[in-house]
Amino acid sequence: MKKIEAWLSKKGLKNKRTLIVVIAFVLFIIFLFLLLNSNSEDSGNITITENAELRTGPNAAYPVIYKVEKGDHFKKIGKVGKWIEVEDTSSNEKGWIAGWHTNLDIVADNTKEKNPLQGKTIVLDPGHGGSDQGASSNTKYKSLEKDYTLKTAKELQRTLEKEGATVKMTRTDDTYVSLENRDIKGDAYLSIHNDALESSNANGMTVYWYHDNQRALADTLDATIQKKGLLSNRGSRQENYQVLRQTKVPAVLLELGYISNPTDETMIKDQLHRQILEQAIVDGLKIYFSA
């Protein structure tokens, strides 16, 4: 104790009031340092330091909203892990950016992020086939549902396999397969169809589910297709279809446009439009398996 008092006397701090002032000043300096040091992390604004992408969620599996460039500025509104939720103040568009592409002190992930579809088994069920032609159009093209469900499924199969998924098809050619024999197990089951009504006015796409464990997949695919597709959106709905009822795995029935509607038929026939829909489905599956 005497040594402490001697040191205080030497420094001219023997007076208790002076000591309190010094301690308060030191604590203020420490607080100010901590505040300034955390400012870059908690700042309301961030700057992009290298070209990157604005995504719909905090993961590289989420779809890209648009490209961002070095020097762009955003308002920071949230953070999950190393991903920053931002808002474009000019357009009010919200999205997520990997923190290491910003001026924030966030170290990049050096490990390659695993593709969420890697190792997953996806069952594709092209509706109808053979003697069961499904719906048909009333235009000069006389398009048949069974043909375009198969085209879509085959194109989607190639895209999914490139992503590392294993794909099982309930049919690969123009043959009839009973509903009972379409019950194939996998991590996800997609039954692909085109809708039709007597009236040519009905249009758009619908995602159907039946069991409760199928709804999350249906809602996710509905959101990603709505984001990218040109078809009007009729939402995600519960329906008692046999292909959904007889399987217990996450399954959906996709009605990708009304073949009885001339505008929808044009999009169903167009390969580029199908590819956009197919990529939206892949994006949705990635998000679903990343959750």
Curated annotation (Swiss-Prot):
SUPFAM superfamilies: Zn-dependent exopeptidases. Residues 118-140 are annotated as: Disordered. GO terms for molecular function: N-acetylmuramoyl-L-alanine amidase activity. GO terms for cellular component: extracellular region; outer membrane-bounded periplasmic space. The keyword Secreted applies. One of its GO terms (biological process) is FtsZ-dependent cytokinesis. Residues 122-286 form the MurNAc-LAA domain. It is an enzyme of class 3 (hydrolase). Residues 1-40 form the signal peptide. This is Probable cell wall amidase LytH. The gene is lytH.
